[in-house]
A protein has these predicted regions:
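Sec-dependent bacterial lipoprotein signal peptides
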Residues: 1-19
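Conserved functional micro-motifs across diverse proteins
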Residues: 19-156, 160-205
Length: 205
């Protein structure tokens, strides 16, 4: 084997090792990693006077949040994480650009309009969310609107979609066609490269 071939082979071996090597994190580090603004799992879209923050929530993230970010042992963590497979979940936070007013109250003309807005989020908005999974078009399997009652400057939609796979093997693109504030179609995509990063993370208990 000549020197050039030997060098190429060595580089390929190093690449393969780096692809399979696990990156260790504590639960706190994992949480920060998933929630990082500007990271691959948290997307922010500004549309008119509103800001939509779309947070992808992997199974381990959900399981850890349910357990207040503290597991008794790794078996408990793995069992709950596996049970959450097959459905992808997102938190969609809806706020105003100014941050001074809750979206339900922003420029509202009165109680009747406020109630119409609230009713939309409670009973209609789920129909206007779509998840594009490769060439598949999926509608929500779970939807909850978390009303802050104007106590803070944002409200939250929790929304889930059932996949044909246990874990995503195609990019995820969440779209919301706004029928309330006329801000158009809101899009947030989680790329396959980003999703594959999760395979190389080892969370320590």
């Amino acid at each position: 084997m000549n020197k050039v071939a030997s060098v190429i082979l060595s580089v390929l071996v190093l690449i393969c090792l780096s692809c399979t090597e696990k990156r260790e994190m504590t639960l706190a580090q994992y949480r920060n990693y998933i929630e990082a603004k500007g990271g691959g799992f948290c997307k922010t879209v500004t549309a008119g006077p509103l800001i939509y923050t779309v947070q992808y929530r992997p199974p381990l993230y959900i399981a850890a949040a349910e357990h207040k970010w503290q597991f008794n042992d790794s078996t408990e963590m793995k069992t709950r994480t596996m049970a959450l497979g097959g459905i992808v979940w997102f938190n969609v936070r809806i706020g105003t650009v100014s941050g001074a007013t809750n979206p339900l109250k922003s420029d509202v003309s009165g109680v009747a309009e406020y109630n119409d807005r609230l009713n939309y989020w409670l009973t209609q908005a789920a129909n206007h969310f779509t998840l594009y999974y490769g060439d598949l078009e999926l509608k929500p399997q779970g939807y909850v609107f978390e009303n802050s009652y104007g106590l803070i400057s944002e409200d939250v939609v929790v929304i889930g979609f059932r996949l044909p796979d246990t874990t995503p093997v195609r990019p995820l693109r969440l779209e919301y066609e706004d029928q309330l504030y006329n801000t158009g179609i809101i899009k947030a995509e989680i790329s396959m490269d980003v999703l594959q990063e999760l395979d190389h993370i080892q969370v320590k208990i």
